[in-house]
């Protein structure tokens, strides 16, 4: 059994609950996390691993609600030095590949495509690392929005120019739009 005591596994889900339960349960196979938590407004789902804590959140009714919650509220569910946020389509499948040196970083996320007109930080530099769908985040990083003013802006700045969709992506906020903070 792999022991990862410094990481809290997190799933935030009000949609696709059966798939979310599968992802959490799979991510807990052969791993002992510092904590594992299923965050939802729908109640503790059936079939959830008994070692996973259920914590109630306000209803997540849109992608903007999800992104807002990740930026400003995930911190309230983490007491370890890091968290691993997973999704129904992005979860742990090879726990033996864990490397404790990853805990030296504030954020590790899957790469975005290489697009010179997208994923730009405030200096116009393309940032490829940041996809939040399966991401390791330090508690220090999660605490930043409560310590400084991190604005909730939609379609502002170079990161959002290519989207023009009225959406706010928490991973883009962390890794590009407000990277300088």
Please provide the spans of the model-predicted regions:
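Short, conserved loop/helix-junction motifs that constitute active-site signature segments
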Residues: 30-31, 77-78, 99-103, 137
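Generic structural signal for small/hydrophobic residues in well-ordered secondary structure
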Residues: 36, 88-89, 138
